[in-house]
């Protein structure tokens, strides 16, 4: 065995580069962090050939003295910390002193820098870690670093780079995170000589709309919270604005982008049933806390952190997010693209880069209350101009669209039971007189269309009733006040072994809900009573369907028992698509929907309500 010897710096730097510089996006991240730490107010990012040919970052930061230039490309040389205690009070993004040494060892590297008060700057070049003597140079105040031919001397690393589209996607996501977290900085990005964006203002919503589509920024929920321990601020997406979890959830600790599973789970759980399966909400959250309470020196990439008290962080983030999303107006607003929409400057048409911009209609980012939309609905009775021909509102038309005026036998009687109060509109107004009720129709025995003050409201009748039944089931089980209707002829059901096992698991909760079921030998049970919402003759089918859905939810979603049972119960008992409703039934369903705590989404996260504004209709008909 050979004797132990210290590795030459050039070899050590290449080894270090394996962790610090994983791909071109890593270079972009490290150089931008240096620019921000230098106090830059303007940063330009220039990319060529997805970073293979060129990554260049230009800033107007403080720059460096000529004596510091050589030190900047040495390992473990930094201006950001000087002693071990500094690691507990980090106020900068960089601190390890590895980045420039690692980057310059695997590229053709050029650095130009000048302090604002100096007449000349300094130029330094490095060819794969072989550093040339720095030279005086004319340059702008600040620093410009150009990294060419990345991994030219490490063929294995260059070989394993992905396609240009994939590598540029990573670069773009990296830059986007900085652009969103540092709105006070002017950002410009060039890709293969094309300008992708140039943000001169500090409007975060404007930047979000650029990246995610027109109106996206205005449709977010703003979050702010502060106490003695930490601050929380940022933006959250509505359930209809689902995203890819990996790239469209941003968490910053003291403005440092981090990856943290606990924070992802806290946000996901705070949304709860507002999300459909395998969906994740958009999140841009900034957490501020004492640097001594978080360790960022976990990995050279500086994306992972360790909290001193992770449970306390979660116990603050979870309720803040939950409170924000539960008080927001989640009704979707329909949006239709204009026939000749202009191309947005800076879109990148790459196969693996998401360049298609979604359209989100502009509506207030501040949360509207349930009462706001309900008042809008009730006010719809007075919106029609008095000069409109009566023929347009002939009663025969309303009758045909609403599919009759009599309750159909298939609809649960409980829907019409006046036991639930109308939602409080919050203004003490008297109810609308029956002859002045808002116009309402049923479309294809599937959707309920209502005239509201600002346009139209469309409700999915099945998921609306699901929401009503779900909250009623939760309340009944929590209050331990079951309401059971005894069957004149009890029904015996033979269950499969797995069904009987599930039945035994949930039998106590079934009783709380209003099911009176007792074992009847072997794998059989006898249904003697059911809740009022269960349709006559469907008792056995409903029970078996509930057991099947409960089992599926338990396996996939890991739901709490009571929540799972309420979801299964509401889904199987709600009025179905294709079921005719009378005008009276539709009005009662709407009133009960708006009496729930969250009328905008069903228990599984699907939207219940869509609004179509008069302004949108005017645009569709070319009136604006």
UniProtKB/Swiss-Prot annotation:
Pfam families: DNA_mis_repair (PF01119), HATPase_c_3 (PF13589), MutL_C (PF08676)
Record keyword DNA damage present: yes
Any GO BP: mismatch repair
DNA damage recorded as keyword: yes
InterPro entries documented for this protein: DNA_mismatch_repair_CS, DNA_mismatch_repair_MutL, DNA_mismatch_S5_2-like, HATPase_C_sf, MutL/Mlh/PMS, MutL/Mlh/Pms-like, MutL_C, MutL_C_dimsub
GO MF, any single term: ATP binding
GO cellular component, one term: mismatch repair complex
Keywords: DNA damage, DNA repair
Region described as Disordered: 416-436
Cross-referenced SMART domains: DNA_mis_repair, MutL_C
UniProt similarity note: Belongs to the DNA mismatch repair MutL/HexB family.
Primary role: This protein is involved in the repair of mismatches in DNA. It is required for dam-dependent methyl-directed DNA mismatch repair. May act as a 'molecular matchmaker', a protein that promotes the formation of a stable complex between two or more DNA-binding proteins in an ATP-dependent manner without itself being part of a final effector complex.
Protein known as: DNA mismatch repair protein MutL
Organism: Chlorobaculum tepidum (strain ATCC 49652 / DSM 12025 / NBRC 103806 / TLS)
Gene (UniProt): mutL
């Amino acid at each position: 065995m050979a004797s132990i010897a210290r590795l030459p710096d050039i070899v050590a730097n290449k080894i270090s580069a394996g962790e610090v510089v994983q791909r071109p996006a890593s270079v972009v991240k490290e150089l931008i962090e240096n620019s921000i730490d230098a106090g830059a107010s303007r940063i330009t990012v220039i990319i060529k050939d997805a970073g293979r040919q060129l990554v260049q970052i230009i800033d107007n930061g403080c720059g460096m003295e000529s004596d510091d230039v050589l030190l900047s490309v040495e390992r473990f040389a930094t201006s950001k910390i000087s002693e071990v205690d500094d690691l507990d009070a980090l106020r900068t993004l960089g601190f390890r002193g590895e980045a420039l040494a690692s980057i310059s060892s695997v590229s053709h590297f050029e650095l130009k820098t000048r302090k604002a008060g100096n007449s000349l700057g300094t130029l330094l070049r490095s060819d794969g870690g072989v550093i040339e003597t720095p030279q005086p140079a004319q340059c702008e105040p600040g620093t410009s670093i150009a990294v060419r031919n990345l991994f030219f001397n490490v063929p294995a690393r260059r070989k394993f780079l992905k396609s240009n589209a994939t590598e540029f996607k990573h670069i773009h996501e990296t830059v986007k995170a900085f652009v969103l977290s540092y709105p006070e900085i002017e950002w410009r990005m060039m890709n293969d000589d094309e300008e992708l964006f140039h943000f001169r203002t500090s409007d975060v919503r404007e930047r979000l709309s650029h990246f995610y589509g027109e109106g996206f920024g205005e449709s977010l929920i703003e979050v702010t919270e502060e106490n003695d321990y930490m601050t929380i601020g940022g933006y959250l997406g509505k359930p209809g604005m689902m995203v890819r979890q990996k790239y469209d959830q941003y968490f910053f600790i003291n403005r440092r982008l981090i990856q943290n599973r606990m924070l992802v789970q806290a946000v996901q759980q705070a949304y709860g049933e507002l999300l459909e399966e395998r969906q994740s909400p958009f999140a841009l959250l900034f957490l501020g806390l004492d640097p001594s309470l978080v360790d960022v020196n976990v990995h050279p990439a500086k994306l992972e952190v360790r909290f001193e008290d992770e449970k306390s962080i979660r116990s603050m983030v979870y309720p803040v997010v939950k409170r924000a999303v539960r008080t927001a107006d989640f009704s979707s607003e329909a949006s239709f693209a204009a026939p000749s929409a202009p191309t947005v400057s800076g879109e990148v048409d790459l196969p693996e880069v998401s360049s298609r911009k979604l359209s989100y209609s502009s509506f207030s980012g501040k949360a509207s209350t349930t009462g706001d939309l309900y008042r809008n609905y009730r006010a719809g009775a007075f919106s029609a101009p008095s000069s409109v021909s009566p023929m347009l509102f002939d009663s025969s038309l309303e009758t045909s669209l609403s599919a009759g005026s009599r309750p159909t036998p298939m609809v649960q009687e409980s829907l019409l039971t006046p036991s639930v109060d109308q939602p409080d509109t919050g203004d003490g107004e008297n109810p609308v007189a029956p002859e002045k009720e808002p116009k309402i129709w049923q479309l294809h025995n599937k959707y309920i269309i209502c005239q509201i003050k600002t346009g139209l409201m469309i409700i999915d009748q099945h998921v609306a009733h699901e929401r009503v039944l779900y909250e009623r089931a939760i309340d009944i089980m929590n209050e331990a006040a079951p309401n059971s209707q005894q069957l004149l002829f009890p029904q015996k059901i033979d269950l499969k072994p797995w069904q009987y096992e599930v039945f035994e698991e949930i039998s106590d909760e079934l009783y709380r809900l209003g099911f009176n079921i007792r074992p009847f030998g072997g794998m059989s049970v006898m249904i003697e009573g059911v809740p009022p919402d269960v349709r006559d003759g469907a008792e056995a089918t409903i029970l078996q369907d509930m057991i099947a859905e409960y089992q599926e939810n338990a396996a996939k979603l890991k739901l709490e028992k009571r929540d799972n049972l309420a979801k299964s119960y509401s889904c199987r008992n709600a009025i179905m698509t294709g079921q005719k409703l009378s005008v009276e039934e539709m009005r009662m369903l709407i009133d009960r929907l708006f009496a729930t705590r969250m009328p905008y989404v069903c228990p599984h996260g699907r939207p219940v309500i869509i609004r179509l504004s008069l302004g949108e209709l005017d645009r569709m008909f070319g009136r604006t």
